[in-house]
Amino acid sequence: MKITASMVSELRTKTGAGMMDCKKALSEADGNIEEAVDILRKKGLSAAAKKADRAAAEGLVVGLNEGSCGVLVEVNAETDFVAKNANFQEFTNGVAKVVVSSKPADLEALKALPFPGTDRTVAEEQTHQIATIGENINLRRFVCFDVAQGAVAVYIHGVGKIGVLVELETSKGDDERVAALGRNLAMHIAAANPQYLNRDEVSAEVVEKEKEIMRTKALESGKPEKIVEKIIAGQINKYFGEVCLLEQAYVIDPDLTVTKVVENLGKEIGAEVTLSRYVRFQLGEGLEKRSDDFAAEVASMTK
């Protein structure tokens, strides 16, 4: 299969590996992008796991907390200038208020609801803002946590670049210490970017894929085959400690895991506390901009 400039460009964007390494990996994988990513990872040439969520979409992530309810909303636009536009900010915050008050089931339901202070629906207000601001605006996603017993914390990092919701279940949800830990955990999640709540959420397929990468690297580094499995056992636990929130080292006190911090709060307030769920929005994650200039740059490397 012929390896094109756009294929090399896509693989390099996904992995951060060099152009020639990407071209070689694509040749070995017969043009299959995902197989090429694995080839580069096994050779230690890829930062794919950490760069997989790089994105270039602009706009805002906003959050709102009212009582036991918390929401995140992401609205995208064409340029980063829009994030500073008062009309755009008012629209995004208005959408968050609609979500808190009405708790719609999905985007379609949200867009059909009345927009505050107007006689328009959310969808009609979106169209109105497109005409006013002069850029395409996309109401991309939202999430709403509403806990029966406990607290929901909201954290927005930077100018709407990252948003986090954390839900703590406890019979003492009104205790300020619960709210304080929720805010700190939300900041931890913004910084540490866990992929799962706990190891039970990691599929067997993902675990086996990680083990195979570890096995290949260990054997290629000259480690005796008889001790490779022991090495993998240690490395897979380290992997869980990196990607699972409850097993991560707490950023405020790295000597403690997140699980231990939550347990300690329960002892302090005299009631069980459970970190039941979280969500992290990163502005534009999964939305890539085309870069024709970059494709042209690598064209000569693929001839």
Swiss-Prot record:
A Pfam family that the UniProt record links to this protein: EF_TS
UniProt KW Protein biosynthesis keyword: yes
Disulfide bridge positions per record: none
GO MF terms, alphabetically ordered: translation elongation factor activity
Source species, domain of life: Bacteria
Gene3D superfamilies in the record: 1.10.286.20, DNA helicase RuvA subunit, C-terminal domain (1.10.8.10), Elongation factor Ts, dimerisation domain (3.30.479.20)
Involved in Mg(2+) ion dislocation from EF-Tu as annotated region, ranges: 79-82
Keyword terms of this UniProt record: Cytoplasm, Elongation factor, Protein biosynthesis
Keyword presence, Ribosomal protein: no
Localization of this protein: Cytoplasm
Main location as per UniProt: cytoplasm
Gene Ontology CC: cytoplasm
Function: Associates with the EF-Tu.GDP complex and induces the exchange of GDP to GTP. It remains bound to the aminoacyl-tRNA.EF-Tu.GTP complex up to the GTP hydrolysis stage on the ribosome.
UniProt family annotation: Belongs to the EF-Ts family.
Protein name listed in UniProt: Elongation factor Ts
Gene: tsf
